């Protein structure tokens, strides 16, 4: 029960701040985060902006969804998704952590949920 409550709370926080991580950070950390994001964009030839555009295009298609599989534990992975402003592109239900169950099990769950006609 305690674990279920914790995950409901995590889902609530994720959905609340998925399009506004600055609201969770507070003014001082938000400004530092925005500066860091600007530096990352400058050093990486705007990879995050381009990734967000691609993910946004995919999510607007009626028969497409974005799914994220990571070997990072779930809570840190969700934090990273929010910090990179990817929360709007990935519903929390479509983020899978392979840390405890392995990649193969994650992909089996994805196939059972979405079917085999996936790209």
Curated annotation (Swiss-Prot):
Q: How does the cofactor attach, per the note?
A: Binds 1 Mg(2+) ion per subunit.
Subcellular localization(s) per the UniProt record: Cytoplasm; Nucleus
Cofactor field: Mg(2+)
- Biological process (GO) annotations? chromatin organization; DNA repair
Q: Which reaction(s) does the protein catalyse, per the Swiss-Prot or TrEMBL entry?
A: O-phospho-L-tyrosyl-[protein] + H2O = L-tyrosyl-[protein] + phosphate
The protein's enzyme class: hydrolase
The entry's function note states: Tyrosine phosphatase that specifically dephosphorylates 'Tyr-142' of histone H2AX (H2AXY142ph). 'Tyr-142' phosphorylation of histone H2AX plays a central role in DNA repair and acts as a mark that distinguishes between apoptotic and repair responses to genotoxic stress. Promotes efficient DNA repair by dephosphorylating H2AX, promoting the recruitment of DNA repair complexes containing MDC1. Its function as histone phosphatase probably explains its role in transcription regulation during organogenesis. May be involved in development of the eye.
Q: State the family named in the UniProt similarity comment for this chain.
A: Belongs to the HAD-like hydrolase superfamily. EYA family.
Know the name of this protein? Answer: Protein phosphatase EYA4
**Which species is listed as the source?**
Gallus gallus
Instruction: Specify the taxonomic lineage.
Output: Eukaryota, Metazoa, Chordata, Craniata, Vertebrata
């Amino acid at each position: 029960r305690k674990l279920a409550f914790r995950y409901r709370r995590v889902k609530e926080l994720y959905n609340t701040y998925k399009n506004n991580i600055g609201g969770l950070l507070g003014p001082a950390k938000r400004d530092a985060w925005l500066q860091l994001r600007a530096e990352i964009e400058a050093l990486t030839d705007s990879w995050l902006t381009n990734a967000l555009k691609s993910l946004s295009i995919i999510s607007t298609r009626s028969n497409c969804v974005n799914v994220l599989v990571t070997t990072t534990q779930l809570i840190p992975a969700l934090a990273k998704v929010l910090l990179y402003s990817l929360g709007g592109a990935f519903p929390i239900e479509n983020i899978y952590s392979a840390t405890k169950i392995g990649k193969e099990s994650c992909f089996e769950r994805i196939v059972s949920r979405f079917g085999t006609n996936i790209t």
